[in-house]
């Protein structure tokens, strides 16, 4: 079996899944104290990198996703699967776990 090189462009979410690049978490507090990784809040904001074709309805039609590539979104804190690609953090989650489009 040949090795597959994973990049953002080779990840194709299925169904209503959305692939999001996670925004960087704060490295230090407002008072200037550096935070260790274990003390950082898990980010809940990111940019949509890839979008699946949409949820399959009972009649066989597809429900078009409400987000597009490039949208900045707010998502549920513990939703989805965390993925690391090329040093960047991503999360793969269902569209229902997206709470809002930001900006």
Swiss-Prot record:
Alphabetical GO biological process terms: chaperone cofactor-dependent protein refolding
Superkingdom of origin organism: Bacteria
Intracellular or extracellular location(s): Cytoplasm
Keywords: Chaperone, Cytoplasm
CDD domains: cpn10
GO cellular component, one term: cytoplasm
PROSITE patterns with a match to the protein in the record: CHAPERONINS_CPN10
Keyword Chaperone: yes
GO-annotated molecular function: ATP binding; metal ion binding; protein folding chaperone; protein-folding chaperone binding; unfolded protein binding
Cross-referenced InterPro entries: Chaperonin_GroES, Chaperonin_GroES_sf, Chaprnonin_Cpn10_CS, GroES-like_sf
Keyword Translocase: no
SUPFAM superfamilies noted in UniProt: GroES-like
Annotated Pfam families: Cpn10 (PF00166)
Family: Belongs to the GroES chaperonin family.
Description of how the protein assembles with itself and partners: Heptamer of 7 subunits arranged in a ring. Interacts with the chaperonin GroEL.
Job of this protein: Together with the chaperonin GroEL, plays an essential role in assisting protein folding. The GroEL-GroES system forms a nano-cage that allows encapsulation of the non-native substrate proteins and provides a physical environment optimized to promote and accelerate protein folding. GroES binds to the apical surface of the GroEL ring, thereby capping the opening of the GroEL channel.
Name assigned to this protein: Co-chaperonin GroES
